Amino acid sequence: MDWATTLGTLSGGIGLFLLGMSMMTDGLKLAAGPALERVLASGTRTRWHALGSGVLVTGVVQSSSAVTVATIGFVNAGLLGLGGALWVLFGANVGTTMTGWIVALLGMKFKIEALSLPLIGVGVVLRLTGTAQRRGALGTALAGFGLLFLGIAMLQTAFAGLAERVALPQDRTALSVVSQLGVGVVLTVAMQSSSAAMTIALAAAQGGLLSPHGAAAVVIGANIGT
């Protein structure tokens, strides 16, 4: 691929991934409905219950921000103590890594184009035929999941092309590590999503543009930037 095609594929892949993640998050939150509030309200009796609730709810709705806002609302309403809220937030930060695990276990090991297009098709059918709000929301989430995987496939293609033209530092010097941390921070701040930055790092490592250690530094930077 030439430079124009590579950069176009890269920007399109990032756009599809962000759009898919947004649709998946919004759809899952609508499908969950008041379950988010019920789990947070009833699952914070002990610190371990609170931690588990944070992990579970964030893993389902794929948005630690939504869990954080709901938790703060419960604290302000006097339904949840500050100690329990802190453990919920700890769990939310663990649960938000679910996207990275999904990408690493599925998106990097299978031919995801074959999975993404059927998901988009089924999701659109559910969205258009869903008379109930929950069914339509589930369709939106499935279509978003498919777009997310399609974006990852485009990122892999783009980074494989970049790896043939660009040679990034592969050493483990302090300067290289700090620069890779900075890349992770900047990506997260620019896209307002540590999950997106994490996925870009994984795709870059898969395409040979980054070493595993470099990708790990970018992921750590993404978690700092969040």
PLM feature spans:
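Membrane-interfacial helix-loop connectors
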Residues: 69-93, 101-116, 120, 188-225
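A structural-propensity feature for long, helix-poor, extended segments
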Residues: 106-137, 141
